[in-house]
Amino acid sequence: MDELKQPPHANRGVVIVKEKNEAVESPLVSMVDYIRVSFKTHDVDRIIEEVLHLSKDFMTEKQSGFYGYVGTYELDYIKVFYSAPDDNRGVLIEMSGQGCRQFESFLECRKKTWYDFFQDCMQQGGSFTRFDLAIDDKKTYFSIPELLKKAQKGECISRFRKSDFNGSFDLSDGITGGTTIYFGSKKSEAYLCFYEKNYEQAEKYNIPLEELGDWNRYELRLKNERAQVAIDALLKTKDLTLIAMQIINNYVRFVDADENITREHWKTSLFWSDFIGDVGRLPLYVKPQKDFYQKSRNWLRNSCAPTMKMVLEADEHLGKTDLSDMIAEAELADKHKKMLDVYMADVADMVV
């Protein structure tokens, strides 16, 4: 397949260094992308302090939750749900991809790793019910639309029985948008998702596609027993990307058709062998994010700032102080006070 790109052969580490000692991301990195772990205890304070190692003083409490939990402590995208005293759900920690990046800033501050967090969870009787691993590929070992065509021709040998895909195109010119391939059912305990991250980010943030360059993302989404098995293996090997490679290789293999032999004996495609080989050599990438509540600031900028500017210009023209008066007279709710505490604190102030 001419359209499937041949992979690079010097993609070995997380960081490469330019001539001026400027560290940049490697074109191929793997990272923890989603965590959900439950504890059969109602001692939410102990879980926050001994598993997350965060000060509850910086967390906002809500008298509501998800998944049947009745309350939530949250620090932006890091969430801790708790159940009613007579409900054996106990406590649940949940971190989205952004939450994982934020939590890495606390791990970095404590000079700890994800493996330390996994170990803390296990020591407190934690049970992992969701664990996602993401691999970002900015060298693009293959074109996902062409990978889809290869799969549709029967050149993908998989333990999954079914696959799904979606995509888009512009009706005015026929130019295609991003393509996503799902291997396995979203309802199953394990499935893979390969998609063109550059298209997703361009649409989400209204960025020209050419500014983002090539960018594929490969996500491994594990639930319940599959998630727990992966964590147990990680604690033994301390090698997240080896586990990722084994999971991908266990479920999906792209091959080159050969009418002279049976399908199960078709040779693995060179691009796929090289991709799997390089993934197996990747260390875990950590990208701590120290900006919290960015969503609130973005909302203020996009939704409120134009109105505030209008009132400010009217004040300046009319000699009034309406805007400054409104700000001075505004009452901060508890959640705003907590957010302000987080804005003004150093990361080290929030860990215990």
Curated annotation (Swiss-Prot):
Swiss-Prot/TrEMBL GO biological process terms: DNA integration
A Pfam family assignment: Rep_trans
Claim: Hydrolase is one of the keywords in the record: no
Domain of life: Bacteria
Keywords, ordered alphabetically: Conjugation, DNA integration
Presence of the UniProt keyword Ligase in the record: no
InterPro entries on file: REP-like_C, Rol_Rep_N
Note: The oriT nick site is located within the nicK open reading frame.
Record-stated family: Belongs to the plasmid replication initiation factor family.
Role according to the record: Probable DNA relaxase involved in the transfer of the integrative and conjugative element ICEBs1. Required for the transfer of ICEBs1. Probably mediates conjugation of ICEBs1 by nicking at oriT on the conjugative element and facilitates the translocation of a single strand of ICEBs1 DNA through a transmembrane conjugation pore into the recipient cell.
Name this polypeptide is given: Putative DNA relaxase NicK
